[in-house]
Design a protein with these regions (language model features):
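Active-site-adjacent beta-strand anchor residues
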Residues: 30, 64, 96, 138-139
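Residues in the short beta-alpha loop(s) of Rossmann-like NAD(P)-binding domains
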Residues: 33, 67, 141
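Structural detector of well-ordered beta-strand residues that form the stable sheet scaffold
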Residues: 28, 48, 92-93, 118, ...
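Acidic, glycine-centered active-site loop in nucleotide-sugar glycosyltransferases
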Residues: 42-44, 77-78, 89, 130-134
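Rossmann-fold dinucleotide-binding core
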Residues: 4, 98-148
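Rossmann-fold NAD(P) dinucleotide-binding segment
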Residues: 51-116
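NAD(P)+-binding Rossmann beta1-loop-alpha1 motif at the extreme N-terminus of oxidoreductases
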Residues: 1-63, 90, 126
Length: 148
């Protein structure tokens, strides 16, 4: 199974991350409020102190956060996920609902750093996230879609 970093374990992210654990993936989670990672750690996830630490060695990095500013905080900067040494050609998957301008900037920045980018906002509610029943609105390069 894949090694996955999951950034943002709030209302939606916790359920999504839980489904990945149940599917057998090796999951490392990060949340700015560490307490929110505890239930996932009890299910077998590893909790990380920074997005960079979570993303280290990952095949894919998934984010599910509240807004553009939270997204920028987990992806960019010295401890952001894009500063991590991940698996070669790692996927970045942004599931948050974000502005068009920021999504374009993030995709370009990820590409410049050697990551493949998938834009994947979701629709649904937390109870549906917990059982893997969300609608995904996926945008990606064709080859990246096939790989994902």
């Amino acid at each position: 199974m894949a090694s996955i970093a999951f950034l943002g374990t709030g209302n939606m992210g916790a359920g999504m991350a839980g489904c990945l654990i149940k599917a057998g993936h090796d999951l490392t989670v990060y949340n700015r409020t560490m307490e929110k990672t505890r239930p996932l750690a009890e299910l077998g996830a590893t909790a990380a102190d920074t997005p960079q630490e979570a993303a280290k060695g990952a095949d894919a990095v998934i984010a599910m956060v509240g807004d553009d500013e939270a997204s920028k905080a987990v992806w960019l900067g010295d401890t952001g996920a894009l500063a991590a040494e991940t698996a070669e050609n790692a996927m970045t998957v942004e599931c948050s609902t974000l502005s068009h301008d920021w999504v374009l900037e993030l995709a370009a920045t990820a590409g410049q750093k050697g990551f493949r980018y998938i834009d994947c906002p979701v629709t649904g509610i937390p109870v549906k996230a917990a059982v893997g029943d969300l609608t995904l609105l996926v945008g990606a390069e064709a080859g990246d879609m096939e790989t994902a």
